[in-house]
Amino acid sequence: MSHAIDELQAIIADLKTELETEPKSSGGVASNSRLARDRIDRMSAEVVDSNPYSRLMALQRMNIVKDYERIRYKAVAIVGVGGVGSVTADMLTRCGIGKLILFDYDKVELANMNRLFFTPDQAGLSKVAAAAATLSFINPDVEIETHNYNITTVENFDRFLDTISQGGRIAGQPVDLVLSCVDNFEARMAINAACNERNLNWFESGVSENAVSGHIQFIRPGDTACFACAPPLVVAENIDEKTLKREGVCAASLPTTMGITAGFLVQNALKYLLNFGEVSDYLGYNALSDFFPKMTLKPNPQCDDRNCLVRQKEFQARPKPVLIEEKAVSEEPLHATNEWGIELVAEDAPESNTTPAETPVMGEGLRLAYEAPEKSSETSEETVSAATADETSLEDLMAQMKSM
């Protein structure tokens, strides 16, 4: 018995040694034993189980997207890889985006497990490193670039500005779209300032502290209101955000609300990048009543961001597109009086003398089963005379009966 116990202890010791000496991945955790698929050079529409893009390329066959493979030449920057940002990155990776640039300086915690995407074994890792490892395994065709710093500091803001200005799919070109998935006002203002300065279109997104509402907002510098044009109530009233949170009480979060908000964000990002459908300028979501408000916010002529004012002037100076109205071809009415061809005839109107219809020309061997007799004018006069005679005789008869 003791010999068996010694053998088991020796096996356990060997397993511990093996785990300690196992090679580590770049994220600091034991490398995943699962094998990632090989990279794919071109997207294929071939319908086979081994093609990860077959269902995406089907959008072309259904005339939703003209050329879906263009997505491989697009670069998107995601700022904030939390509840909304991580799911957004996951969806874009599965859609086959060409390049993802992730910004975040926070770490994965067990408190994040109520959200989607991250797993408990990633606790303690930086969010961008954990996300990059998972996303690369999901789709190795996507180029993923990570930046683990706070973009709101003066030094890091310049780095952020350079990255979104020159980090496109083609070196030296700007990214195609910036997605804001942050949870604080300072970071949103930093993204807003950078995009106004570089004239980049971007989406702002957010989920409320009570976790039952969310929104996305598409911001086109100069065309729609930037984030500084209509600041939230917290800033408009000069209230510190920290004073709104009671001590010991944290903001609530639901994976459902965050997943819905991320879905709206990615759906509209795809419509913008691939040029199909209608991109919503502002789309909200209220989970309590399933209410989805939509609106467009115009820029503020007195905006505090000077670059926003410059973009407004540039937008106003652009030539307005000329809309050519197509004149509808109106068909002439079937009847001069009404379009239904109905003609009203008074009851006391005299009957028109209609000529009998001509006998249609019949084919050889065919004949009419019935021919209506023609009414002559003499027959009509005789009928009227007979009726008059009958009426007179009846009156005489009545007079005779009364005299009896």
Curated annotation (Swiss-Prot):
Changing residue 325 to K: In strain: MEL18. CDD domains: ThiF_MoeB_HesA_family (cd00757). GO terms for molecular function: ATP binding; metal ion binding; UFM1 activating enzyme activity. It is found in: Cytoplasm; Nucleus; Golgi apparatus. The active site is at residue 250. The keyword GTP-binding does not apply. Residues 372-404 are annotated as: Disordered. Belongs to the ubiquitin-activating E1 family. UBA5 subfamily. Interacts (via C-terminus) with Ufc1. Interacts with Ufm1. This is Ubiquitin-like modifier-activating enzyme 5. It comes from Drosophila melanogaster.
